[in-house]
């Protein structure tokens, strides 16, 4: 379980949120919503330990995140707004970098992400959407319980969004957890996704 307790965050003397508390249990996914500058990416960075809140605490499995950072990161898949891939490598080589023991599974993961036939193309030659898919192919390889995804559908077409949404639904159905930001509707998932709205100051599920 991931838990936020009474989080407070301020940027440039402006309060992004205060008193923010919620939990994400096994089998749940949460969509963080809010306008530009509302603090969506900042919140994800706090939840992953990449930044510290100005007040409050994040907990993992009942322990303060700062005390269990190593075990937490073994349970985490974080994909930020930037793809975080190496443009000089091919799609296959990028996945191998993150998942060196899964060589036989790499082609299928890339196919699931819509990159069949592009496995050995240098990433620098791929479109922005295809580069995003290289990063998201990790969703078919990772064993992490918690997925935190910042705008995963950027530059992804409608069919790709549907495919990725189905993968997230399968992950939560197996007891995984998903937290994501997106401005796009989640096809077929409206009844299962909890929404956390950041509106400046207070926030609520």
From Swiss-Prot:
SMART domains from the UniProt entry: AAA
GO aspect biological process, one term: cytochrome complex assembly
Annotated GO MF terms: ABC-type heme transporter activity; ATP binding; ATP hydrolysis activity
Signal peptide limits: none
Reaction equation(s) it catalyzes: heme b(in) + ATP + H2O = heme b(out) + ADP + phosphate + H(+)
Entry's localization field: Cell inner membrane
InterPro entries: AAA+_ATPase, ABC_transporter-like_ATP-bd, ABC_transporter-like_CS, ABC_transptr_haem_export_CcmA, P-loop_NTPase
Superkingdom of origin: Bacteria
GO cellular component: plasma membrane
Residues that, per the record, bind ATP: 34-41
EC number assigned by the record: 7.6.2.5
Residue span, ABC transporter domain: 2-205
Enzyme class, first EC level, given as a word: translocase
Keywords: ATP-binding, Cell inner membrane, Cell membrane, Cytochrome c-type biogenesis, Membrane, Nucleotide-binding, Translocase, Transport
CDD domains from the UniProt entry: ABC_CcmA_heme_exporter
Bilayer topology: Peripheral membrane protein
Entries under PROSITE patterns matching the protein: ABC_TRANSPORTER_1, ABC_TRANSPORTER_2, CCMA
Subunit description: The complex is composed of two ATP-binding proteins (CcmA) and two transmembrane proteins (CcmB).
Function comment: Part of the ABC transporter complex CcmAB involved in the biogenesis of c-type cytochromes; once thought to export heme, this seems not to be the case, but its exact role is uncertain. Responsible for energy coupling to the transport system.
Family: Belongs to the ABC transporter superfamily. CcmA exporter (TC 3.A.1.107) family.
Protein name: Cytochrome c biogenesis ATP-binding export protein CcmA 1
Organism per entry: Salmonella paratyphi A (strain ATCC 9150 / SARB42)
Designated gene of the protein: ccmA1
